Every structure is written in structure tokens, then in C-alpha cells.
Amino acid sequence: MTYSICYIVPPHILREIAKKGNNSQRAWALQTLTISEQFRGRREVVSLMPTVFAVAGEKRRTVYDAKSGYVLPGTLVRGEGDPSTGDVAVDEAYDGLGATYDLYKSVFDRNSIDDRGMRLDSTVHYGANYDNAFWNGSQMVFGDGDGEIFQRFTKSIDVI
């Protein structure tokens, strides 16, 4: 099975920001592009990783915190049934993963996104001012944005 790395903000948009943004915007856009290129090279490795499945019909969400670093998945900060953490990005990711599971269950009668009970994992606070979010074949990863052009990527259910 081959997995693709799917980004929310496409590379051509980041290249335009790198060309036309102010100094800090250009720096963050170039940093995001560089990290994105590194992940494209890891695509094959991710596809070889085992997928963890939940018991049929059970919602199972896990949210990790990269703490502005680049190591995935990061530190586990919230699992299925755990109370709200008070970290807005963590709680938005958790709630968004739940809405995603519920959508697939109620509209498509699927057991998670793959119909085989796939655990829904995500990592928040990825990178320093990382201007993107992506699916790496096994989890969603959310940057917090630079605060000028992009805000945290957990704010929009369309991203999650």
C-alpha cells in the first residue's frame, strides 16, 4: 500500500509567500517548504509502518503534542475519553477527530475513515510557526501558523 503526504496549503502558495512576503513571512514559508520536502522523502517509510486498528465500531482518538519540534508523534496529551486539557489546539484536534469519525459513521456507515476501525491520531504544535497541516499516511499533523498569514490549523473543521 502506498500513502501520500497531503498538505492543506499547497507548495505553490508557500512559494509565492516566500517571494512576496515580508522578511518574517518569507522565512516561515521557506522553513515550511523545507520541512515539506523532507516529508516527501519519508513517504515510503511511513507506508511500511503497521497500522493500529481499534475494536470494530469504537471511536478511538489520540492527540500528541510536538511541543514546537519536528519529532512525530510527540508526547501523548489526550486519549479517547480523557477530559479537556485546556490547550485549545489539543481540544480542537480531539473534537475535530470525533466529528470526522461521526461523519464517516453516520453518512457513510463506515467504521472510521478506512472502514476497518483505524485509530484517529493527530499531532498539534508541530514545528515553530509551521504554516501547514498534513496527513502523513497514518495521522494528521497541525502547525500553529505564523500568526500573520496563517493561524493554528486546528481552528477549522475543514482542515481536520
Segments (PLM) and residue ranges:
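Zymogen propeptides/activation segments of proteases
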Residues: 1-159
